[in-house]
Amino acid sequence: MNPEEIRQRRLQEMQAKAQAQGAANDPEAQRQMQEQQMQYEMQKQKILRQILSEEARSRLARIKLAKPQFAEQVEMQLIQLAQAGKLPVPLTDEYFKGLLDKIYEMNRPAKKEITIMRK
């Protein structure tokens, strides 16, 4: 099970528990959810520090500022690949650039082409 699936499952469990108790507006339940989210983020950052070199982490931080959703997706894929043992550790900036290109190409929408025919 990958970290994203674990996170989604925990989030669903917490939401179901909050609804069952009628505590959706309860500040304690909200605080608990925020705390669990913070723990998840800290764990993710710890793994990324182990996987990425300093330059690669810097590049990922800049990507996160410009495109947060893409950066989140890249982080999840990096963690999955590292857990599967498919990445050299620590990941160099050059290797990271290549991975970013591949991930971007996979997620890029198909190029739309318009042809104008004149009579």
UniProtKB/Swiss-Prot annotation:
Q: Name one GO molecular function term.
A: DNA binding
Report the transmembrane regions from the record.
none
Q: What keywords is this UniProt entry annotated with? A: DNA-binding
One of the Pfam families matching this protein, by short name: dsDNA_bind
The record ties this protein, via SUPFAM superfamilies, to:
Double-stranded DNA-binding domain
What InterPro entries does the annotation carry?
DNA_bind_arc (IPR022889), PDCD5-like (IPR002836), PDCD5-like_sf (IPR036883)
- Bias (Basic and acidic residues) occurs at 1-12
**Region described as Disordered: spans on this chain:** 1-35
Please tell me whether the keyword Cell inner membrane is annotated for this protein.
no
Coiled coil residues, start to end: none
Q: Name one GO cellular component term.
A: cytosol
PANTHER family to which the protein is assigned, alphabetical: PROGRAMMED CELL DEATH PROTEIN 5 (PTHR10840:SF0)
The family classification in the record reads: Belongs to the PDCD5 family.
Please state what the protein is called: DNA-binding protein MMP0157
